[in-house]
């Protein structure tokens, strides 16, 4: 820290304390990563909402506490209200539970309560007000049917207009726009990383390695070939009539076009 302080490495606090498949929530410690949590959630046909571009090695708790917006959201508020409750150790050593759960069995409840609302006080503080040691988060079901559509546009204004028309009708849970630089970066092949993923391994703590020369060349070609902006929308069907849901959303998109 620039002005003094203590850095605490919490990666060994990596237990998934509870998963509630019925109410779509989980209780985790700060060292739990996206890849670790998703590996367990798949056994229950659930998934964790992930910010765009976050590495699998990132801490779920830290990411949510810093309010990194996720793309699996119909609006910004939904994507930043994924925390139910959390326990924070104050500088005095006291344990403070945020979200006012009346008992241990109520951790998955909404954070509103009759007392003062400290729910957002510690969010975005980067640990300067205390250390969060447990957090209850909301989950999403794994889609049974999924279609990803790409809509090319020439300007950011057109991309925004298209996104607004789609989101007014709440079509798809993921809807966002990328310019050709960012989209090309996501599409560049990484043979070493692909090999690790097939083995069940993920990006290490310190992120991906420097690109090879052929990857740089591929990135430049992709960027030149891609449209200036691309709107990406994911249509997904969950437990009930997934094919039917995806089909009527595709028809609604055609009507918008």
Language-model-derived ranges and their functions:
Residues 1-13:
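Glycine-rich N-terminal segment of FAD-binding domains in flavoprotein oxidoreductases
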Residues 2-4, 100, 112-117, 222-227:
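Glycine-rich, flexible loop segments associated with nucleotide phosphate handling
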Residues 5, 148, 230-232:
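Beta-sheet entry/capping signal
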């Amino acid at each position: 820290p620039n002005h003094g302080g203590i850095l605490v490495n919490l990666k060994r606090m990596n237990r998934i304390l509870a998963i509630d498949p019925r109410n779509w929530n989980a209780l985790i410690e700060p060292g739990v990563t996206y890849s670790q949590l998703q590996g367990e959630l798949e056994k229950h046909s659930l998934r964790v909402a992930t910010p765009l571009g976050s590495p699998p090695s990132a801490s779920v708790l830290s990411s949510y506490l810093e309010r990194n917006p996720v793309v699996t959201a119909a609006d910004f508020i939904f994507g930043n209200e994924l925390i139910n409750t959390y326990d924070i150790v104050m500088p005095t050593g006291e344990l403070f539970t945020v979200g006012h759960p009346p008992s241990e069995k109520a951790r998955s409840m909404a954070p509103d309560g009759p007392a003062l609302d400290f729910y957002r006080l510690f969010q975005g503080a980067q640990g300067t007000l205390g250390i969060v040691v447990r957090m209850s988060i909301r989950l999403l079901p794994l889609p049974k049917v999924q279609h990803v559509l790409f809509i090319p546009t020439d300007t950011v204004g057109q991309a925004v207009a298209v996104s607004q028309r789609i989101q007014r009708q709440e079509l798809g849970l993921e809807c966002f726009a990328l310019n050709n630089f960012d989209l090309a970066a996501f599409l560049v092949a990484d043979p070493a990383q692909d090999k690790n993923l097939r083995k069940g391994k993920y990006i290490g703590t310190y992120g991906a390695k420097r690109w090879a020369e052929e990857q740089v060349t591929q990135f430049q070609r992709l960027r030149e070939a891609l449209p200036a902006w691309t709107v990406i929308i994911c249509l997904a069907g969950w437990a009930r009539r997934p094919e039917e849901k995806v089909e009527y959303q595709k028809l609604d998109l055609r009507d918008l076009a």
